[in-house]
Amino acid sequence: MNEIRAAALSDHLYNKAAFRRIPLSGTFELSPLCNFACRMCYVRKTPQEVRAHDRPMLQFGDWLRIAREGREQGLLFLLLTGGEPLLWPRFWELYGELVDMGMLVAINTNGSLIDDEAIARFRRRPPRRVNITLYGGSDGTYERLCGVRGVFSRVDRAIRGLKAAGISVKLNCSLTPDNAADLEAMVAYAKELGLQLDLAHYMFPPIRRDPSAIGVNERFTPAETARSRVRGIELQQGMDAARAFLERVKGGCAEPPGLEEGCYDPVDGRVRCRAGSASFWVTWDGFVTACGMMPQPRVELEGRPFADVWRELTEATAALRLSGVCARCENRLLCHPCAAMAAAETGSTEGVPQYLCHVAKALRRMADEI
């Protein structure tokens, strides 16, 4: 019941914040550096690439200033991400300052750097939640997808250690052809530990990392994405739930795949994106964007009060337009196209993301077979 009440309260706050253009939620992308080299990553850079970049990484004082000025504007929920945020040199110092500031801080991490000392630090200053991305169910899968050896056992120890310490943990999983064979094992693992596992079957083209990657990523074909979605529901909720999902598909309305929390309304399933109206994302090199999956709109942060930056971002976001084709499509409540998806798939928020069209059609075909 507490979780239900918390979710309802959070939704109420977000709705009010979006109406009043209050930056209730923010993401701090501390660094593009990561000890993994996942093939589908949208942001990762090597140290050499960071040094060659035309803008420096934000520093400790920069992040503190943004947090303090953001708090004055209504910032409460804060997500620390990367890259791998625990690699950032002053992570623990910044984390402590943010928690002491009254922020409700969550962390996105691959979990490989969470040892006993890290767990002890989290116990002293508990985060709102630690989100750990599970990339497979074995060391071999991690090596194939992430380019790292002997890591799954470390991640497993971290997850079990956090849970034993009473730290809130959620598992995320980005499904690709390289780890699809582990889906059943990952679902079983989450059930064994009694943890939520969110499956993302859709991989955004990494246009922030590589502007030429429009419509391209290490991902499933549309038909494979459709099958993966149904299989995930079957494994997590049972055959009856999978059949009910396909019945909703047949009716033309089903919950969207792989979107972040808060992207869609849990009542009617419609995408109600809060990016740029109640939430923001700060990139490692000092831009404020509406969403981390798209490079535009973005606002220069350096030397400007956060209040001015936020105002400019809300105006730029409100001016975004999606394709009228999508708005009229009979499958619009199956693929749920958003501005970030359209931009990543076509290069424009007004483009028609054909990949999603094909996923929706594949789901329709599956639904017609039941």
Regions found by a protein language model. Name each.
Residues L58, P89, G150, D178-A181, ...:
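Residue-level signal for the nucleotide or nucleotide-sugar donor/cofactor binding architecture
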Residues G83-E84, M203, A342:
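Short, solvent-exposed turn/loop segments enriched in Gly/Ser/Thr/Pro and often Arg
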Residues P85, L113, L175-D178, Q296:
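Short histidine/acidic/glycine/proline-rich micro-motifs that form metal-
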